[in-house]
Amino acid sequence: MKPVIKNIDSFSNPILGTKDGVPTVVSLYHDHAPGESSKHHSHPWEHQVYITSGSGIVWVDGEEFSIKQGDFILVPPNSTHHFKNTGDGMLSRITFNPKESEEYL
């Protein structure tokens, strides 16, 4: 396997995945404008989320957690969850999923 380098300003989701030769992890990038939320959903895999900028709230199985730039979040498998930007600037995050998630994208 060879290294793959992509710039955040010129990519499409997934950032990195099996099409790039990555065998186990799919990386996705999401931006949320102030007041915007992601879709409330669940899936059978856990995933990790890194907040690259902004602040907001993540709901996981009905429980609310404040999030901000620099936070790393583990969302358990089969949990219902969504993110909401409660700040004044953009809420940006990178999500790391197992490769099985790619078929749902």
Task: Explain the meaning of each model-derived region.
Residues 1-25:
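A short, N-terminal "cap"/entry segment at the start of jelly-roll beta-barrel domains
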Residues 16-19, 37-43, 84-86, 105:
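Short histidine-centered beta-strand/loop micro-motifs
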Residues 27-43, 77:
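Conserved short histidine dyad/triad with adjacent acidic residue
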Residues 31-32, 43-58:
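Short, conserved beta-strand element in jelly-roll/cupin
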Residues 62-77:
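Short acidic-glycine-tyrosine-enriched beta hairpin
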Residues 77-103:
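Ligand-binding loop in jelly-roll beta-barrel domains
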